Amino acid sequence: MEFSIHICEYNRSNTDCETIYRPEGSGDYLFLLFKKPMKVYDGTAFIIAQENACLFYTLDHEQHYQAVQKLRNSYVHFWCGENLGEKYGIPQNTVFYPQNTEAIDELIRLQQREYIVKDPYAVEYEEALVRQMMIMASRGMRRRSRPDCTRNFRSCALRC
């Protein structure tokens, strides 16, 4: 199977103003959900990513971000034989703001549980959860780009 979670943490808090800097990337895919504002280096300068921003880093892309004050996020480092960001239309190596961050965060919580407990079929379930998270983020971006859609699923499905 061409899938594995390397590390997954839900609602992780680190020290104030902590900086993460991986000039060569981490060698795996990284999906981040920022719970607090973060400074993110975009290749030329730091930008401020607001609360509930997401970031999907590809395999060898530089990862450079710093907490504005307190670092709090949920994240998943994973390996997959295909680029799920590309497959599902997720912005790569740049900050984005899906509408449904609570649901995305819940999927990361479930992934962390599965990663720790290792119940039967854990790898298959972890892959399903990561794919669901990526699809949910993609759909959350589409809703954001369609302002006439409301959060009500039925009315959105009928109009969009």
Question: How would you name each of these model-derived features?
Answer:
Residues 2-94:
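N-terminal regulatory/effector-sensing and dimerization cores
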Residues 76, 80, 101-160:
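An amphipathic alpha-helical interaction segment
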Residues 95-99:
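Short acidic-hydrophobic, aromatic-tinged amphipathic segments that line or gate anion-handling sites
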